[in-house]
């Protein structure tokens, strides 16, 4: 069991989100405006899966697309910053997961913790989210 660990965002790898109007995205949680790959009424599911970058991003993501703590993390090549929705809806872009347990453990070893401070309110749209900023501070 010790070898078990997270293996990256499953959006467009082994998950799909299908909205009521036929819009396809890699995960039901992802924002439609940014992550819609197409509509099942206009394209085949196979074409949406294979040809659209909105669904392919999790299959093709590398360490080079990561930023912040996640880019330098020991698990970066496997985890690739974990859940894309978590980072995107919190920090405005994917590639740096502020809710990672390993991250907390490693920062604690350095006597540091992180907290999120709100920077922008959610715009009151479907699948909306506000913006936060990571603030590092010494452990109390």
Predicted regions and their residues:
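C-terminal accessory region of radical SAM enzymes
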Residues: 1, 23, 29-74, 80
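Short, small/polar residue-rich loop motifs at catalytic or cofactor-binding pockets
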Residues: 9-13
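Short capping/connector residues at structural and topological boundaries
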Residues: 14, 42-45, 105
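Gly/Ser/Thr-rich beta-alpha loop segments that engage phosphate groups in nucleotides
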Residues: 14, 28, 83-84
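Short, acidic, Ser/Thr-enriched surface-loop or helix-capping motifs
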Residues: 18-19
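Short Fe-S-cluster ligation motifs
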Residues: 55-58, 97-140
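Cysteine-cluster motifs in flexible loop/terminal segments that predominantly coordinate metals
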Residues: 64-110
